[in-house]
């Protein structure tokens, strides 16, 4: 099966698997890779510049990694065939960064007031304990793109005996994440709004790819110098370069 996968999809699966295995090996030696490569709140002392990229390749366990990579393997090849490898990789990374940006905003709204009420030592300890890992934002972005580009593809989902259109599936997942984010349970440690961030940035990127050139052309036309147009009665030829000569 791996042989038939396009290159970026295959390499994403391999990299995520290697990172998960590395986290297990390092944990046996007392090193928590998820802490160093996972995403921290931007004001935390353990936040590093590489974390917005590395966090999306780390996972909390086999199940977390398996289901994310299963989704990449299911939907990624169709997108990579449609867009090409370069554009698919850009999309994957941008949606992953979209998850990171939204999660940082959520922390700023929810965590920052708590940190401000604590003494500096306790605030620093709490900030460093909050970590986000996983490729779920990129996966939700991939799901959105598949439903956008192939809306009428029918899919079977576990525990649902009838096929569902890809577009409908995207809407269902988005609503589930939205409601779960608005009314989280006390034991819920899933970054639901961050998942929606992957979808939002995926939507923006797809719209830019589809309509960006048209927008840029219209924007350039606003500032392009206008030339005089002169029309004769017998036709509508554009005489922008017509030269007038005084009679001798």
State what each model feature region is:
Residues 74, 78-79, 147-152, 204-213:
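Structural signal for the C-terminal ends of transmembrane alpha-helices
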Residues 17-33:
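Alpha-helical transmembrane segments of multi-pass membrane proteins
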Residues 1-21, 86, 116-127, 177-248:
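C-terminal transmembrane module of polytopic alpha-helical membrane proteins
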Residues 29-32, 150-160, 211-220:
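Juxtamembrane/interfacial segments flanking transmembrane helices
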Residues 31-57, 124:
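Extracytosolic (periplasmic/ER-lumenal) interhelical loops and adjacent juxtamembrane/interface segments
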Residues 52-148, 182-197:
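Transmembrane helix-loop-helix
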């Amino acid at each position: 099966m791996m042989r038939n996968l396009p290159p970026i999809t295959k390499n994403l699966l391999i990299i995520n698997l290697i990172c998960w295995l590395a986290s297990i090996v390092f944990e046996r030696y007392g090193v928590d890779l998820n802490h160093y490569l996972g995403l921290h709140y931007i004001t935390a002392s353990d936040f590093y510049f590489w974390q917005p990229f590395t966090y999306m390749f780390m996972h909390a366990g086999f199940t977390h990694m398996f289901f994310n990579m299963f989704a990449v393997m299911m939907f990624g090849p169709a997108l990579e065939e449609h867009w090409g490898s370069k554009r698919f990789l850009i999309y994957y990374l941008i949606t992953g960064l979209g998850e990171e940006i939204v999660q940082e905003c959520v922390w700023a709204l929810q965590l920052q007031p708590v940190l401000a009420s604590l003494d500096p030592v306790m605030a620093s300890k709490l900030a460093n304990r909050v970590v986000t890992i996983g490729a779920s934002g990129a996966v939700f972005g991939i799901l959105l793109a598949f439903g956008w580009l192939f809306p009428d593809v029918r899919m079977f989902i576990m525990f649902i005996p009838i096929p569902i259109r890809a577009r409908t599936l995207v809407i269902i997942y988005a609503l589930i994440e939205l409601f779960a984010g608005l009314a989280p349970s006390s034991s819920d440690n899933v970054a639901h709004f961050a998942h929606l961030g992957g979808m939002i940035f995926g939507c923006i990127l797809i719209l830019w790819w589809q309509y960006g050139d048209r927008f840029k052309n219209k924007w350039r036309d606003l500032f392009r110098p206008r030339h005089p147009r002169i029309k004769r009665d017998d036709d509508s030829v554009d005489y922008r370069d017509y030269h007038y000569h005084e009679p001798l």
